[in-house]
A protein has these predicted regions:
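Key DNA-contact positions within bacterial/archaeal DNA-binding proteins
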Residues: 47
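Short, intrinsically disordered or compositionally biased N-terminal tails of bacterial proteins
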Residues: 1-9
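Glycine-centered, phosphate/nucleic-acid-interacting loop/turn motifs that mediate DNA/RNA or nucleotide
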Residues: 60
C-alpha cells in the first residue's frame, strides 16, 4: 500500500507562505514600507522575511529602495499575475523522488502509476489558482 503523508508533502514552503503574506501586506498599505514593520505585524523574523522579500524583488512582484528612506512596495505591474504563476515560481512540486529524473533511483518508476496521479493533482491545484490574481489577495 502506498502511503502519502499529505501534511508533509502537499504543503507550500514557508518561503512561499511568507511571500504571499508580504504581498497581502503591501497591497493593504500605501507606499513604501519597511521589512521590519511587516515582520512585526506577522510575528516573523526579519531575517527570514528578508529571504522572501529578495525572491519577490527578483521575480519583480515588489520594488525595493535602498537607504534611510528606503523600503519595499508592491509592483502594480504584478497585480494581474495569477496565484498559479507566483506559486509555480516559488515551488518545485517534486512531491516524490521520481519527479526529478536526475535524482530518481526508484526501481518501479517505469511501471508506477503514482507519478501520473500526483501530476494530475498538481495540475488541478495550479489550474484552480489560475482563477485568482495577485490583486485578489487583499
Amino acid at each position: 500500500m502506498i502511503n502519502i503523508n499529505v501534511k508533509e508533502n502537499m504543503r507550500l514552503k514557508t518561503k512561499t507562505d511568507y511571500c504571499i503574506r508580504v504581498l497581502i501586506y503591501l497591497q493593504s498599505h500605501e507606499g513604501r514600507v519597511k521589512i521590519q514593520d511587516i515582520a512585526q505585524s506577522y510575528g516573523i523574523s526579519k531575517n527570514h522575511l528578508s529571504v522572501a522579500v529578495n525572491k519577490l524583488a527578483e521575480l519583480k512582484y515588489i520594488i525595493t529602495t535602498q537607504g534611510p528612506k528606503g523600503g519595499i512596495e508592491f509592483n502594480k505591474e504584478a497585480q494581474n499575475k495569477t496565484l498559479s504563476e507566483l506559486i509555480s515560481q516559488l515551488e518545485d512540486f517534486q512531491i516524490v523522488e521520481c519527479f526529478d529524473p536526475e535524482s530518481n533511483t526508484c526501481t518501479i518508476s517505469a511501471h508506477c502509476r503514482l507519478k501520473g496521479m500526483l501530476n494530475k493533482a498538481n495540475s488541478a491545484f495550479l489550474n484552480e489558482l489560475k482563477k485568482y490574481k495577485i490583486k485578489d489577495l487583499s
